[in-house]
Amino acid sequence: MTTTDDRPTETANVRLGLAPTDPRPANETGPLADRQKTNPLFNDQKMKLGLFGTNCSFGLIMSHAASSYEVTWEHTKAIAQRADQMGFEALIPVARWKGFGGSTNFNGNCFETYTWAAGLAEATEHIAIAATSHLPTMHPIVSAKQATTIDHISGGRFALNLVMGWVTPEMEMFGGSQREHDRRYAFGQEWIDYAFKLWSETGSFDVDGEFFYGRDVEAYPKPVQGPRPALVNAGNSASGIEFSARNVDVNFASLDTLENVKTYTSSLKEKAKSEYSRDIQTMTYGLIVCRDTEAEAKAAFQNVVDEGDWGAAGNVIKIAGSGASQSFDHVVKEYQERFIAGWGGYPIVGTPEQVTEELVKLNEAGMDGMIMGLIDYKEELEIFNDDILPLMKQAGIRH
């Protein structure tokens, strides 16, 4: 990628006059639709729903617990189409270039997320489809163009989940060295500023920043969604919160208690409003285990833990605990089993009534959505459809 280290010398910096001589037509230079109308992430459901991790091996569980889940195109497509039929708002993939070792090599078998999103955009009708992108691995010009293309394929349903690349062994595969935590967010801010211009500028422009350099930059067409595609970020550190409040539409948070959820969501939403005059949604993730009885649900959850890949979990905890990510600090110290059963997220275990009650509590604490993992996505979506969705409607958090 062309960064500021690759700036051409003054003698080589000659403009070749390739900019269009006539104004570009409206279908190239402007958004085609209001994203409030095309992207379900902006609908009026009180508690939005989504699936997390249906593109990579073992989903959200580091475990050999029995499941029909597999990483094949037909399987992931079937899951996406069923969630779409059920009225879920979003599919958010995990971006992974290297597994976490252990006996499962957790998440090591993984579909690349932009092409995954493009395929599912064509295969679905209503649900928002995200790509999760490690910003250090993608130039903004390439990523913005891919995002625009998927937005056109989907009719304005695309979302881009921006991640800074906290897994050091993974980032080192690309030949560079890992930046310090706050420097990753400084890079991310310049990256997204560049992308914003690519999605909005109707003519060519120059970029001359700390991390990126470009001359006569242009990008056509623009996304379907105006003013830009939906953006997601999962940063929960001070730098991550600042980045989210300033730039994105959904903050994706890993939290441990309802009290912390309430404090976190109110603080972030107030920061976005008071400092940047923006509205932001907060959503969480975690493993949902629902069975007919509480005992059955707890037994299924415990089986995930008992069959856990503690080697992979230990590797994740080691990387997160090294300071590579500050978003998991509280989880690393106190809730190691949550990595085995839910990737460090908020677990909900119980009967349909208990699951619904917990979702209501999360919503009352300020969460606008739950992006869930399931032990067996394809099979357990039917439990959610038949037993939980009706109760959520009765509770007033879905309609």
Explain the meaning of each model-derived region.
Residues 47-51, 91-93, 129-133, 158-162, ...:
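Hydrophobic faces of well-ordered beta-strands that scaffold small-molecule active sites
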Residues 90-114, 255-258, 372-385:
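Glycine-rich, proline-tolerant flexible connector loops at the mouths of alpha/beta enzymes
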Residues 141-143, 148-166:
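Hydrophobic or amphipathic alpha-helical targeting/insertion segments
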Residues 10-55, 81-85, 174, 181-227, ...:
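An alpha-helical appendage that flanks or caps ligand/catalytic pockets
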Residues 71-96, 243-251, 361-367:
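Catalytic domains of carbohydrate-active enzymes, especially glycoside hydrolases
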Residues 49, 83, 87, 120, ...:
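Conserved, mostly hydrophobic/aromatic
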Residues 104-130, 187-191, 274, 384-399:
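Alpha-helix-loop-beta-strand connector modules within alpha/beta enzyme cores
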Residues 59-74, 132-141, 177, 225-238, ...:
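Active-site mouth loops of central-metabolism enzymes
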